[in-house]
Amino acid sequence: LHEQKVTRVFAISFSFSFGLLITGTSWVYVSLHNFGGMHPVLAVIATVFLSAIFALPPAIIQTALAKLVSSPSRRMLIVFPVGLALSDWCRGWFLTGFPWLSIGYSQIPLSPLSNYAPLLGIYGVTLACAFCSGGVGYLFTYLSVNRANPKWKVGVILPTLILFLSIVLGSVRWTEKISQSAT
Protein backbone atom coordinates (compact mmCIF):
# COMPACT_ATOMS: atom_id res chain seq x y z
CA LEU A 1 0.00 0.00 0.00
CA HIS A 2 3.14 2.13 -0.10
CA GLU A 3 2.66 5.22 -2.31
CA GLN A 4 -0.54 3.85 -3.86
CA LYS A 5 -3.50 5.94 -4.91
CA VAL A 6 -6.54 5.49 -2.72
CA THR A 7 -8.50 3.67 -5.44
CA ARG A 8 -5.61 1.25 -5.86
CA VAL A 9 -5.49 0.70 -2.09
CA PHE A 10 -9.12 -0.39 -2.28
CA ALA A 11 -8.40 -2.79 -5.16
CA ILE A 12 -5.34 -4.31 -3.46
CA SER A 13 -7.11 -4.70 -0.10
CA PHE A 14 -10.22 -6.16 -1.70
CA SER A 15 -8.17 -8.61 -3.77
CA PHE A 16 -6.18 -9.78 -0.75
CA SER A 17 -9.29 -10.20 1.39
CA PHE A 18 -11.24 -11.90 -1.37
CA GLY A 19 -8.38 -14.34 -2.03
CA LEU A 20 -8.15 -15.18 1.66
CA LEU A 21 -11.90 -15.62 1.99
CA ILE A 22 -12.53 -17.60 -1.19
CA THR A 23 -9.93 -20.18 -0.15
CA GLY A 24 -11.25 -20.30 3.41
CA THR A 25 -14.90 -20.64 2.43
CA SER A 26 -14.73 -23.48 -0.08
CA TRP A 27 -16.76 -25.51 2.40
CA VAL A 28 -19.70 -23.19 1.68
CA TYR A 29 -19.77 -24.51 -1.89
CA VAL A 30 -19.60 -28.09 -0.61
CA SER A 31 -22.44 -27.44 1.83
CA LEU A 32 -24.64 -25.75 -0.75
CA HIS A 33 -24.01 -28.21 -3.59
CA ASN A 34 -23.32 -31.57 -1.97
CA PHE A 35 -25.63 -31.33 1.02
CA GLY A 36 -28.13 -28.69 -0.06
CA GLY A 37 -28.58 -29.94 -3.62
CA MET A 38 -27.92 -26.52 -5.16
CA HIS A 39 -26.84 -26.46 -8.81
CA PRO A 40 -22.99 -26.21 -9.01
CA VAL A 41 -23.04 -22.91 -10.91
CA LEU A 42 -25.37 -21.32 -8.37
CA ALA A 43 -23.27 -22.70 -5.50
CA VAL A 44 -20.14 -21.14 -7.03
CA ILE A 45 -21.93 -17.82 -7.53
CA ALA A 46 -23.22 -17.86 -3.94
CA THR A 47 -19.76 -18.67 -2.54
CA VAL A 48 -18.09 -15.96 -4.64
CA PHE A 49 -20.77 -13.44 -3.66
CA LEU A 50 -20.42 -14.27 0.05
CA SER A 51 -16.63 -13.92 -0.14
CA ALA A 52 -16.95 -10.63 -2.03
CA ILE A 53 -19.36 -9.24 0.57
CA PHE A 54 -17.01 -10.18 3.41
CA ALA A 55 -14.04 -8.72 1.50
CA LEU A 56 -15.64 -5.27 1.32
CA PRO A 57 -15.16 -4.15 4.96
CA PRO A 58 -11.36 -4.73 4.99
CA ALA A 59 -11.06 -2.87 1.70
CA ILE A 60 -13.19 0.00 3.00
CA ILE A 61 -11.22 0.18 6.27
CA GLN A 62 -7.84 0.21 4.50
CA THR A 63 -9.08 2.80 1.99
CA ALA A 64 -10.45 5.07 4.73
CA LEU A 65 -7.20 4.85 6.67
CA ALA A 66 -5.18 5.51 3.51
CA LYS A 67 -7.27 8.64 2.87
CA LEU A 68 -6.56 9.87 6.38
CA VAL A 69 -2.81 9.21 6.19
CA SER A 70 -0.96 10.38 3.10
CA SER A 71 2.59 9.62 4.26
CA PRO A 72 3.81 6.42 2.52
CA SER A 73 5.99 5.41 5.46
CA ARG A 74 3.14 5.85 7.94
CA ARG A 75 0.91 3.83 5.66
CA MET A 76 3.33 0.91 5.78
CA LEU A 77 4.18 1.15 9.46
CA ILE A 78 0.81 2.14 10.93
CA VAL A 79 -2.10 2.10 8.46
CA PHE A 80 -1.52 -1.37 7.01
CA PRO A 81 -1.05 -3.15 10.36
CA VAL A 82 -3.88 -1.35 12.15
CA GLY A 83 -6.19 -1.72 9.16
CA LEU A 84 -5.47 -5.44 8.84
CA ALA A 85 -6.04 -6.12 12.54
CA LEU A 86 -9.15 -3.92 12.65
CA SER A 87 -10.67 -5.59 9.60
CA ASP A 88 -9.94 -9.07 11.02
CA TRP A 89 -11.62 -8.05 14.25
CA CYS A 90 -14.64 -6.50 12.49
CA ARG A 91 -15.11 -9.56 10.30
CA GLY A 92 -14.87 -11.91 13.27
CA TRP A 93 -17.08 -9.98 15.67
CA PHE A 94 -19.56 -7.84 13.78
CA LEU A 95 -19.99 -9.81 10.61
CA THR A 96 -19.67 -13.22 12.30
CA GLY A 97 -17.42 -13.91 9.35
CA PHE A 98 -15.05 -16.80 9.80
CA PRO A 99 -12.79 -15.65 12.63
CA TRP A 100 -10.59 -18.71 12.04
CA LEU A 101 -9.34 -16.95 8.90
CA SER A 102 -7.69 -14.32 11.08
CA ILE A 103 -4.04 -13.77 10.14
CA GLY A 104 -3.04 -14.39 13.76
CA TYR A 105 -3.95 -18.07 13.53
CA SER A 106 -1.15 -18.53 11.00
CA GLN A 107 1.29 -17.89 13.86
CA ILE A 108 -0.16 -20.41 16.32
CA PRO A 109 1.51 -22.48 17.87
CA LEU A 110 5.04 -22.47 16.41
CA SER A 111 5.83 -18.81 15.77
CA PRO A 112 7.35 -16.64 18.50
CA LEU A 113 4.51 -14.20 17.80
CA SER A 114 2.12 -16.72 19.35
CA ASN A 115 3.47 -15.59 22.73
CA TYR A 116 1.26 -12.50 22.42
CA ALA A 117 -1.89 -14.67 22.47
CA PRO A 118 -2.26 -15.10 26.26
CA LEU A 119 -2.00 -11.34 26.74
CA LEU A 120 -3.67 -9.85 23.64
CA GLY A 121 -5.65 -12.69 22.08
CA ILE A 122 -5.62 -13.73 18.46
CA TYR A 123 -6.22 -10.21 17.19
CA GLY A 124 -3.15 -9.03 19.10
CA VAL A 125 -1.16 -11.75 17.34
CA THR A 126 -2.61 -10.49 14.06
CA LEU A 127 -1.52 -6.95 14.94
CA ALA A 128 2.01 -8.08 15.87
CA CYS A 129 2.28 -10.07 12.64
CA ALA A 130 1.03 -7.10 10.61
CA PHE A 131 3.48 -4.70 12.30
CA CYS A 132 6.33 -7.11 11.51
CA SER A 133 5.14 -7.37 7.90
CA GLY A 134 4.81 -3.61 7.62
CA GLY A 135 8.32 -3.17 9.01
CA VAL A 136 9.82 -5.69 6.60
CA GLY A 137 7.94 -4.11 3.69
CA TYR A 138 9.20 -0.71 4.79
CA LEU A 139 12.76 -2.08 4.97
CA PHE A 140 12.70 -3.50 1.45
CA THR A 141 11.02 -0.41 0.03
CA TYR A 142 13.64 1.94 1.47
CA LEU A 143 16.55 -0.33 0.55
CA SER A 144 15.34 -0.50 -3.04
CA VAL A 145 14.85 3.28 -3.28
CA ASN A 146 17.67 4.85 -1.29
CA ARG A 147 20.15 2.84 0.77
CA ALA A 148 21.88 6.00 1.98
CA ASN A 149 18.73 7.15 3.77
CA PRO A 150 18.90 5.89 7.38
CA LYS A 151 15.10 5.59 7.57
CA TRP A 152 15.36 1.98 6.38
CA LYS A 153 16.57 1.04 9.87
CA VAL A 154 13.03 1.45 11.19
CA GLY A 155 12.16 -1.60 9.09
CA VAL A 156 14.70 -3.61 11.07
CA ILE A 157 14.05 -2.13 14.50
CA LEU A 158 10.25 -2.54 14.55
CA PRO A 159 10.08 -6.30 13.79
CA THR A 160 13.11 -6.93 16.02
CA LEU A 161 11.45 -5.20 18.98
CA ILE A 162 8.20 -7.06 18.41
CA LEU A 163 10.00 -10.41 18.20
CA PHE A 164 12.18 -9.63 21.23
CA LEU A 165 9.15 -8.70 23.33
CA SER A 166 7.45 -11.87 22.12
CA ILE A 167 10.38 -13.97 23.32
CA VAL A 168 10.23 -12.22 26.70
CA LEU A 169 6.48 -12.90 26.88
CA GLY A 170 7.19 -16.55 26.07
CA SER A 171 9.19 -16.90 29.27
CA VAL A 172 6.21 -15.87 31.42
CA ARG A 173 4.08 -18.65 32.92
CA TRP A 174 0.53 -17.49 32.35
CA THR A 175 -1.08 -20.46 34.10
CA GLU A 176 -0.19 -22.84 36.86
CA LYS A 177 -1.36 -26.30 37.73
CA ILE A 178 -3.57 -26.32 40.82
CA SER A 179 -4.07 -30.03 41.42
CA GLN A 180 -3.92 -33.40 39.75
CA SER A 181 -7.05 -34.41 37.91
CA ALA A 182 -8.65 -37.71 38.92
CA THR A 183 -9.35 -38.63 35.29
Locate each region found by the language model:
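Membrane-embedded alpha-helical bundles of multi-pass enzymes
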Residues: L1-S179
